[in-house]
From Swiss-Prot:
It is found in: Cytoplasm. Pfam families: TK. This is Thymidine kinase. Coiled coil: none annotated. One of its GO terms (biological process) is thymidine metabolic process. The keyword Kinase applies. It catalyses: thymidine + ATP = dTMP + ADP + H(+). The active site is at 89 (proton acceptor). GO terms for cellular component: cytosol. ATP binds at residues 9-16, 88-91. InterPro entries: P-loop_NTPase, Thymidine_kinase.
Length: 209
């Protein structure tokens, strides 16, 4: 039975790596997948989904006006049966788009796997995450670690000096240089202005090609 899944975490927990591995698992078994990625996230190039450890795949882009059920129906009409839809950066979905993805599951009987942040740099839910938490059939946390050694559940936006940024737009695309995953206790401390956090994380070594 097809389901709507939401895999959520703080920054740098390996969400995109997990998405790409899931897509690979389907394709390895001869099943066709569609990866959806927001237009506003073009760090790796438009329509390219890339993880921090070097995995990459092409995806279809969407913005807040894209009707996702129609997008998937057109994909099937053009390319044949589809076995799974995977959504990167799902926090950027609108509530209407989350509902459309639930229709992909319920009407087309295609599983939809969404990967995204739960909360923004203020500790507040993104719209997409809010409605995925409400409507998804299955919820799973992808865990990562705070510099304190505790589980990281929050994401803080920092400036060049490592101090918390408390104002600004909710959506600001950036990677390790802008955001740090922390525990709730550390989030409270840095938001109070107690200390700083080095925004740069050690690059992961890649195996030789």
């Amino acid at each position: 039975m097809a389901k709507l899944y939401f895999y959520y975490s703080a920054m740098n927990a390996g969400k995109t790596t997990t998405l790409l591995q899931s897509a690979h698992n389907y394709r390895e078994r001869g099943m066709r997948t569609s990866i959806l990625t927001p237009k506003l996230d073009h760090r790796a190039g438009s329509g390219v989904v890339a993880s921090r450890i070097g995995l990459r795949a092409d995806g279809q882009t969407f913005d807040r006006q894209t009707e996702l059920l129609q997008l998937i129906e057109r994909d099937i009409a053009a390319h044949g049966p589809l076995h799974c839809v995977l959504v990167d950066e799902a926090q950027f979905l609108s509530s209407a788009q989350v509902w459309q993805l639930s229709e992909v599951v319920d009407r087309l009987r295609i599983p939809v796997l969404c990967y995204g942040l739960r909360t923004d740099f203020r500790g507040e839910l993104f719209e997409g995450s809010q409605f995925l938490l409400a409507w998804a059939d299955e919820l799973e946390e992808i865990k990562t670690i705070c510099h304190s050694g505790s589980k990281a559940t929050m994401t803080v936006r920092v400036d060049a000096q490592g101090h918390a940024v408390q104002d600004g737009p909710q959506v600001e695309i950036g990677g390790n240089e802008r955001y740090v995953s922390v525990s709730r206790a550390e989030f409270k401390k840095i938001m109070r202005g107690e200390g700083r956090i080095d925004p740069l994380q050690i690059a992961l070594p890649l195996p030789p090609a």
